[in-house]
Amino acid sequence: MQLTPLHVTGGRQLGGEIAVQHSKNAALPIIVATLLSSEPITLHGIPRLSDVYTILELMHHLGTRHAWVGPNSLTLHTPEIENTDAPYALVSKMRASFIVLGAILARAGTATVSMPGGCAWGPRPVDQHVKALRALGAEVIEDGGNFFAHREGSLNGSFVFELLTVGGTHNAILAAALGEGTVTLENASIDTDVVDVIEFLNALGARIEGAGTNTITIHGVKELHGGEYTVIPDRIEAGTFMMLAAATRSRLTLTNVRPDHLRAVTSKLAEMGVDIQEDGNRMVVDARGRDLKPVNVTTQSYPGFPTDLQPQMSALLATVPGTSVIQDPVYPDRLTHVAELHRMGATITVSGYTQVIQGGTLHAAPVKAADLRAGAALFIAGLTCEGETVIDGVQYLNRGYERLAERLRGIGGEVMQPEPMLAADD
């Protein structure tokens, strides 16, 4: 069934309270990490997103049985690995699925995983994943778009990542968590999602040290037991709603947030003139009546400004008079939103990974999202301007934002997604 576009009518202030979902980017590797245990595990805070259903389809192929036991609670059980391959038809849908390589290798000793897919912008190679596994004693062969991995005994040794990689760090941790070896990872990612995966594994009996630092040490254990765990809040969704409040010059209260995960975003919005108040896991973002200032932004790995919020920041800065500059060296090709914002009247000049934005007033237009975060930029832009903006490519938004239209309506947004017309033989 073809998804119908989002119809967004903006030009009004938003207000009220919106609960931030739990982190998709932590939930996906944590779901994969349940492969390391033969006992049932219940996860809380699992967003019902298309990416989650995709990874569950792959997990089912590998031998996992799952059941939703609450609106966002999921029990998974993998008594044994039934298949050690992750075929292209499943892996090609989503890049994050590649970390099953390390998990299957740890549990079964051998794994075959196809090259990953996901959002269609730019190259995001997996060479650091493969180099890490090889350095730790696994044999990994690439042939015809597939990776064949095998280990004899436990992984051991150390590896220095050549660049910061969240997925590569996940894969190496999962591969080394079981067994009798000791593995040290240097220049490892300190991303919040990596920390959450480590804390989840340790809750099941793993022995992993150094979470939140660039040096992670994994002492292999014989087995992991079952248990329960709650995934952290989604800092990217929180940042998206913070920018929505700023772009629409509104006051929004965000709940279920981790302000300590949002320092780079908070400081940049404060520099623009947005008032932000924190109270535990609540955050009030107030841009009412404020003349926001242009800023310069450069993306970095955590704890820097996240590349996953770069398109949303472009949409916000397109509404701020003056000249702003955004540089995204993390993913230089993440620019699919720019042409669509042009259709809405934005003035953005691109050179390499640099955007020079002359802020002004946007207008409604038909646009199309080509990836998840571009879609977020477009619904932010649509809610800033009068008239109806029709956003196609809703399938990408469904990868990262749960019940988006319903939740935006809850804070005063006029956002509709008509039911699709069914053919007579459907």
Curated annotation (Swiss-Prot):
Sorted keywords for this record are:
Cell cycle, Cell division, Cell shape, Cell wall biogenesis/degradation, Cytoplasm, Peptidoglycan synthesis, Pyruvate, Transferase
Catalytic activity, as annotated: phosphoenolpyruvate + UDP-N-acetyl-alpha-D-glucosamine = UDP-N-acetyl-3-O-(1-carboxyvinyl)-alpha-D-glucosamine + phosphate
* Gene3D superfamilies tied to this protein: Enolpyruvate transferase domain
Q: Does the keyword Cell membrane apply?
A: no
Q: Which GO terms describe its cellular component?
A: cytoplasm
Q: Does the entry feature the keyword Transferase, yes or no?
A: yes
Described purpose of this protein according to its UniProt entry: Cell wall formation. Adds enolpyruvyl to UDP-N-acetylglucosamine.
- Quote the PANTHER family the UniProt record gives: UDP-N-ACETYLGLUCOSAMINE 1-CARBOXYVINYLTRANSFERASE
Protein name per Swiss-Prot or TrEMBL: UDP-N-acetylglucosamine 1-carboxyvinyltransferase
* Species of the source: Deinococcus radiodurans (strain ATCC 13939 / DSM 20539 / JCM 16871 / CCUG 27074 / LMG 4051 / NBRC 15346 / NCIMB 9279 / VKM B-1422 / R1)
